[in-house]
């Protein structure tokens, strides 16, 4: 199964709790910046993603240096460099 777990976001933002497996997630983002999320069971295989709110990439360095582990680190660098 899959879920959504936010690992990082803009400074000062309280990240939501990890979602339950195989449950739909609806999020509202009020703070501009980059948010990093993973599928917890599959993150080391590269199942990660980014949400960019308001075209604000000011926290890009924080996000690109986050250590997820496994294949995810390479994928994270690719995703951030595409911004």
What are these regions (language model features)?
Residues 1-83:
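Extracytoplasmic copper-binding redox domains, predominantly the cupredoxin/blue-copper superfamily
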